[in-house]
Structures are given as C-alpha cells and as structure tokens.
C-alpha cells in the first residue's frame, strides 16, 4: 500500500515536471529547475576554494568544503553526517 502510494506520488511529480518543461522555451530550464529544487548554485561554474559534493579529492588533505569529507574508499567529497 505504501509503495503504491509512493509510486503514484512520484508519477504525479514526474508528470508535473515534464508538463512544466514542455511549456518552457528556455534552454537553461533543467539547470534552473535543479537549482531551485536543491537551492544551490553549483551549476554556474564559479570558482571556489573548496571542493563540493562529488568532486575528486585526496584523503587527508582537507580539500572539501565545510560539512563535506573526502571518502577514503571512493576518493571524492561526500556530505559528512558525523558519527
């Protein structure tokens, strides 16, 4: 029951996004939509002094942004949730 409700809700959200995308004539629509959904501006290509989520890093060098940590296993910055 919960799974079917989740799938129905996900389908409605997908239908809304596709409908909104079909009405939009701007080329940067996907970037704007993702920026609004996640409330971040990582898509503009701005230079910053730290590495964000998914950027490659070297463990132990503290290159990742605050609230992120370099994964020893995957060698990229992940969100640090603490222990």
UniProtKB/Swiss-Prot annotation:
Residues the record lists as Leucine amide modifications: 81
Transmembrane segments: none
InterPro entries per UniProt: Huwentoxin-1 (IPR011696), Huwentoxin_CS1 (IPR013140)
Tissue expression from the record: Expressed by the venom gland.
UniProt keywords, alphabetically: Amidation, Disulfide bond, Ion channel impairing toxin, Knottin, Neurotoxin, Presynaptic neurotoxin, Secreted, Signal, Toxin, Voltage-gated sodium channel impairing toxin
SUPFAM superfamilies from the UniProt entry: omega toxin-like
GO molecular function, one term: ion channel inhibitor activity
Signal peptide coordinates: 1-21
Subunit structure: Monomer.
Described purpose of this protein according to its UniProt entry: Lethal neurotoxin. Selectively blocks tetrodotoxin-sensitive voltage-gated sodium channels (Nav). Does not affect tetrodotoxin-resistant voltage-gated sodium channels or calcium channels.
Record protein name field: Mu-theraphotoxin-Hhn2c
Organism: Cyriopagopus hainanus
Lineage: Eukaryota, Metazoa, Ecdysozoa, Arthropoda, Chelicerata
């Amino acid at each position: 029951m919960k799974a079917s409700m989740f799938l129905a809700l996900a389908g409605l959200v997908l239908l809304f996004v596709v409908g909104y995308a079909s009405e939009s004539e701007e080329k940067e629509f996907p970037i704007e939509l993702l920026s609004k959904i996640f409330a971040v501006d990582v898509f503009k290509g701005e230079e910053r002094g730290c590495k964000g989520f998914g950027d490659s890093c070297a463990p132990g060098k503290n290159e990742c942004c605050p609230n992120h940590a370099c994964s020893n296993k995957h060698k990229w910055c992940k969100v640090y949730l603490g222990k």
